[in-house]
Amino acid sequence: MTTLADLRINIRQTLRTPPPVLNHVLPGLLAGTVGSLIAPGGLGKTTLLTQIGCAIASGNTVLGGALDGTDRSPGKVVLFLAEETLAIMHRKLHEATEQLVSSMASQNKKDQHALLGLLETNLGIYPLGGHGSLVHMGEGTKECRELFELCANARLIVFDPLRQFHDGDENDTAFMTAVVARFQRLARDTGSAVLLAHHANRSSISSGTGEQVGASRGCTALTDGVRWQANLSPVSDALASELGIERADLRDYVRLDCSKANYARPSATVVLRKAPESGLMTLWAPGQSSNRAATAKKRPVATQ
C-alpha cells in the first residue's frame, strides 16, 4: 500500500534528471489523466468519439490532424457507450471506417485488410444500450474489476455519457467529486487518458454559450476535477457570418473548443462539417464551400 511518505518527490534526483516528455493522447489531454467532452444531446458526441477512437486505434490522423496527439502509432481504445445499441454502432463503425478508407493514400485490398486488422486488435466498443447496469465504478465490485481488465494498456478510454455510469445526484458536489476520483484512479492505474462525455446545461444551450467552460450540466465538480475539457456546440449566426458559412447550412456545422487545458496552451476553435446522412465530421476551414457536399460514394471495406 502506498503511503504519503512514498509520494514525496526526491528533490535531488528530480533536479538532476530532465523532465519526461508529456504524452498528449489528444492535444492537452495527457495519458493518465481525466478529461471531458461537453455537448447538448443529439449534436454528435458519440459519432465524434467513434471517429476519434477509430483514428487512434488505426494510427491515422484525428480529424485531419486537428486532434493529433504526441504518439501517432496505433493504440488501444476502449469505448463504453451506455445509450447505444449494437445495430446503431454497427452502422457508425461502418461509416467511420469508410471515411478512414477514403482518406488513405492507397486503397488496395492489402491496405484495407491492414486497417481492419488494427481496428480488430486495438478497438474495443461496448454498446451497452439496455445493459447500463453492467458497468459500475463502485470500489471492489466485480464490474469494476472486469472494467479495469478490459482497459489494461489502453491509450484512450471513453465513457458516454457519464450520467449512465453513476446513480447519484450530479448537482451534489461531494458525490461528483468522488465520481471523478474513481475515474482518476482508472486513469492512474491503466496509464490511459479517460474521456467522459457529458451533457451541456440548459443555460448554455439557450444562451448560445456552449463553448464556455461552465457549459457542463450539474455542479462544477466535474469541470474542476478534470484536467481537460472540450466543448462541442452549434455554430452561432455570428461565427457563421465571420467564417462565411451560409445560414441555411448552419445545421451541417459544429464547433469544437478546448475550454480547459491544464497542460497545454489554449487552442483555436475547430469547425467541423457534418455529413448530411451519417453525421460524420470532417475538418472545415474558411474558404471551403459552405454548401452541403454531395454524399460521397461509399467504398466497401474488404473483409476477406
Language-model-detected regions and their locations in the chain:
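Short gly/ser/thr-rich secondary-structure transition/capping motifs
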Residues: 16-21, 138, 210-213
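Conserved alpha/beta core segments of nucleic-acid transaction machinery
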Residues: 261-304
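Short helix/loop segment immediately N-terminal to the Walker
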Residues: 62-72, 108-110, 205-206, 240
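Alpha-helical scaffold elements adjacent to nucleotide-binding pockets in ATP/GTP-utilizing enzyme cores
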Residues: 52, 88-96, 143-146, 178-182, ...
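Phosphate-binding/switch region of NTP-binding enzymes
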Residues: 36-38, 42, 47, 80, ...
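The Walker A/P-loop phosphate-binding site
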Residues: 1-99
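Conserved inter-motif catalytic segment of the P-loop NTP-binding fold
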Residues: 2-5, 71-170
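Conserved catalytic network of the ASCE P-loop NTPase/AAA+ motor domain
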Residues: 29, 69-73, 117, 149-151, ...
